[in-house]
Swiss-Prot record:
Forms oligomers. InterPro entries: MraZ, MraZ_C, MraZ_dom, MraZ_N, MraZ_sf, SpoVT-AbrB_dom, SpoVT-AbrB_sf. PROSITE patterns: SPOVT_ABRB (PS51740). One of its GO terms (molecular function) is transcription cis-regulatory region binding. Residues 5-47, 76-119 form the SpoVT-AbrB domain. It comes from Mycolicibacterium smegmatis (strain ATCC 700084 / mc(2)155) (Mycobacterium smegmatis). This is Transcriptional regulator MraZ. Keywords: Cytoplasm, DNA-binding, Repeat, Transcription, Transcription regulation. One of its GO terms (biological process) is negative regulation of DNA-templated transcription initiation. PANTHER family: TRANSCRIPTIONAL REGULATOR MRAZ. It is found in: Cytoplasm, Nucleoid. It comes from the Bacteria.
Length: 143
């Protein structure tokens, strides 16, 4: 399970060091793809394969699902962390997420999100009030 907030730096070669506590779960390979709100999603390879299979099954008859699958496949990059736990983010991914040197990696239960530190701070400020409302309304049946 991926939980917590971490603040790694992006180096000049576009490499990001993954949090040490997640490296074992990602050692078998991982998939980096574009996500909502101009962030990146990092899935363990097996989790991504499940997601892609579900999208592929739905895509045969649904134009929106086919478009989603195309976008997902085109925007995804397979990575294997190096000995120091670093992955190289493509120039396209860095541009999409507006990544500067200061990044934030957050756990999102079954995957990680990579954000530019400033964008993450702005996102949190903009959605702080929504947290209480979501807890009351959206999560009523879960919690």
């Amino acid at each position: 399970m991926f939980l917590g907030t971490y603040t790694p730096k992006l180096d000049d070669k576009g490499r990001l060091t993954l949090p040490a506590k997640f490296r074992d779960a990602l050692a078998g390979g991982l998939m980096v793809t574009k996500s909502q709100d101009h962030s990146l999603a990092v899935y363990p390879r097996d989790e991504f394969e499940k997601l892609a299979r579900r999208a592929s099954q739905a895509s045969r008859s649904n134009p929106e699902a086919r478009a989603f699958l195309r976008s997902l496949a085109a925007a995804t990059d397979e990575q294997h962390p190096d000995a120091q736990g670093r992955i190289t983010l493509s120039a396209d991914h860095r541009r999409y997420a507006n990544l500067s040197k200061d990044c934030v990696v957050i756990g999102s239960v079954d995957y990680l999100e990579i954000w530019d530190a400033q964008a993450w701070q702005e996102y949190q400020q903009a959605h702080e009030e929504n947290f209480s409302a979501a807890t009351d309304e959206t999560l009523r049946d879960i919690i």
